[in-house]
């Protein structure tokens, strides 16, 4: 496995941000360098999970027994939330994307606990540093991932409260992360 320094990890996140959204990238340039790097890391994670859910990213997953069990457990929770609704994808594709989100969730926990290694994905290396420097809540990242899980199902918000809940997950939670 490739080893990444913290500087390389932040450079990777900056590249993701610059390539994905020149508007966001330009607006972030007004921030102080340390805050800008942290925002690039958060943006890179959000872009990555969105690309996975949309099928624009093929995640490399080391499928372990722990990951399979965690995915099964998370799928039961998501099935309860979306009771009566089938995923938008084939069962195999849905499982693959759900497993990728669970893997990311587990890695976020490791980053918040400062247990990421230099061989982990550069986004997690950068986020580990962000968790150390800023009072960011892991729960807000989990809320963003819950919004991505919702995107694996047909979005059919029928009430204002349903729309508000969805928007909170995919937008407001990101804002809560960034204001820290």
Which residues does each predicted region cover?
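Acidic catalytic motifs of isoprenoid enzymes
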Residues: 1-180
